[in-house]
């Protein structure tokens, strides 16, 4: 907590000398050793993503997500069609370099340049991406880009019952900050949101 006080003796927050709001994330390609983070392109990525997602025959990957499962490629493509035009969320595809195939999607969302805060979300990792270096590196590349732009805080929120997502957040260096009860309705269910953050030093 702050040890600074104002002229009234009230505790106040730390000053941010020279603070300027960062630019919004742009549609650019982020290149790593195992993967590329590419702006979502329906014509280029839809079929590859659908095929990768379809390896989850039971549909387990969709349990805690707002979309899916999808019964056909046409249904998935129709859901995907408007996403590339969105500015917030700003969608990307995760491409496995070894396979040369899109294997997952994610987005920057709740983009708040004025306060230097951005959230990563809409994460849909196919079985080809789950628990692989591609998953770790894709999240690293997105986080790195946000901090390079000058964002002070990078957030990850998930269903409080999603143990896998909570473990992934902890492994990536996020810190648990609290639970938001009755925060969201997801697929007709009440969703308790598990909030974590990865604040920068300034």
Walk through the language-model features, giving the residues of each.
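GNAT-family acyltransferases
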Residues: 1-132, 145-149, 187-202
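Short, conserved glycine- and acidic-residue-centered signature motifs
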Residues: 135
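Flexible ATP-lid and adjacent glycine-rich G1/G2 motifs of the Bergerat
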Residues: 142
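Conserved GNAT acetyl-CoA-binding A-motif
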Residues: 148-157
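Conserved beta-strand-loop-alpha-helix junction that forms the acyl-donor binding cleft
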Residues: 156-166
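Conserved catalytic-core motifs of GNAT/GCN5-like acyltransferases
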Residues: 157, 175-189
């Amino acid at each position: 907590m702050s040890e600074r006080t104002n002229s009234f003796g009230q505790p106040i927050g730390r000053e941010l000398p020279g603070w300027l709001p960062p630019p919004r994330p742009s549609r650019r390609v982020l290149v790593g050793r195992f993967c590329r983070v590419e702006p979502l392109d329906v014509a280029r990525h839809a079929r590859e993503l659908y095929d990768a997602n379809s390896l989850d025959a039971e549909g387990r990957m969709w349990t805690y997500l707002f979309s899916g499962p999808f019964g056909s490629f046409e249904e998935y493509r129709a859901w995907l069609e408007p996403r590339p035009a969105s500015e917030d969320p700003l969608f990307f595809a995760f491409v496995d370099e070894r396979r040369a195939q899109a294997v997952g999607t994610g987005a920057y969302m709740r983009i708040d340049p004025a306060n230097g805060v951005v959230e990563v979300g809409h994460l849909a990792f196919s079985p080809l991406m789950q628990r692989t270096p591609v998953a770790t590196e894709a999240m690293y590349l997105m986080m790195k880009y946000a901090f390079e732009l000058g964002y002070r805080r990078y957030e990850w929120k998930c269903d409080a019952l999603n143990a896998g997502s909570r473990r992934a957040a902890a492994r990536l260096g996020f810190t648990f900050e609290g639970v938001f009860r009755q925060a969201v309705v997801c697929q007709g269910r009440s969703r308790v949101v598990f909030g974590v953050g990865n604040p920068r030093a300034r």
